[in-house]
Design a protein with these regions (language model features):
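Glycine-rich cofactor phosphate-binding loops and adjacent beta1-alpha1 units
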Residues: 56-57, 87, 97, 101-102, ...
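Hydrophobic alpha-helical segments typical of transmembrane helices
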Residues: 11-12, 22, 44, 75, ...
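Glycine/charged-rich beta-loop-alpha catalytic/anionic-binding loops adjacent to active sites
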Residues: 22-33, 60
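Glycine-rich phosphate/adenylate-binding loop and adjacent beta-alpha elements
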Residues: 1-25, 38
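Mid-domain Rossmann-like dinucleotide-binding core that forms the NAD(H)/NADP(H) cofactor-binding site
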Residues: 35-113
C-alpha cells in the first residue's frame, strides 16, 4: 500500500486501515487482480515521466518504447495529457495503431531496420530531436534511441 496521504512512500502489509477518502472504487470491467495492479503501473509511469524525465511540458517530443505494456500505456496517457508529442515503438503494428488512438503522434516498428531514421522523419520541423525516452523494452533502444536525444537529455528506464 502506498501513495496515500498517510503513507506517501508506500508500505507492505496484508491488511491496512484507511480513511474512506483514501479509496477509489475499482472499475467494474477489471478483476480484483487487474484493479490492484493499476496503481503500480500508474505510479511507475508517473515517476518515469514526471519525476525522472523532467519533460512533462507541451510540445516536448517523448519516445515511449515497448508500447502495449501497462507502464508504457500509462506514460503515453500522461504525456498526451501534458500535450507532448508522443512517439511510440513496438514490434506490433496493432499496438502502434492503438497507441495513436490513445494520443500518440506516430510510431515505429523496432523490428524494422532503420526504425530510428523513420522516427527522426516523424519529428516536427524545428524540433528534430527527442526530449526524453521512457524505455521499458530494452533491445537496441539505448544504442539507437540515444542518438535521437538532444545532448544531455534524460533517458528513463
Amino acid at each position: 500500500m502506498g501513495g496515500t496521504k498517510y503513507n506517501p512512500a508506500g508500505t507492505l502489509a496484508e491488511t491496512v486501515v484507511l480513511d474512506a477518502g483514501e479509496l477509489e472504487e475499482a472499475p467494474v470491467h477489471l478483476s480484483d487482480a487487474e484493479a490492484a495492479a493499476l496503481p503500480l503501473t500508474g505510479l511507475t509511469a508517473w515517476r518515469a515521466f514526471f519525476t525522472k524525465s523532467g519533460n512533462a511540458k507541451p510540445g516536448r517530443n517523448i519516445l515511449v518504447t515497448g508500447i502495449g505494456g501497462g507502464v508504457a500505456l500509462m506514460v503515453l496517457l500522461f504525456a498526451a495529457a501534458q500535450e507532448c508529442n508522443v512517439f511510440v515503438s513496438s514490434g506490433s503494428e496493432e499496438k502502434i495503431t492503438r497507441a495513436k488512438e490513445l494520443g500518440a503522434v506516430g510510431g515505429v516498428n523496432y523490428k524494422e531496420e532503420g526504425w530510428e531514421k523513420k522516427l527522426l522523419g516523424m519529428l516536427p520541423e524545428g524540433r528534430k530531436w527527442v526530449d526524453a525516452i521512457v524505455d521499458g523494452a530494452g533491445g537496441d533502444v539505448v544504442q539507437k534511441g540515444t542518438r535521437l536525444l538532444k545532448v544531455s537529455l534524460p533517458f528513463s528506464c
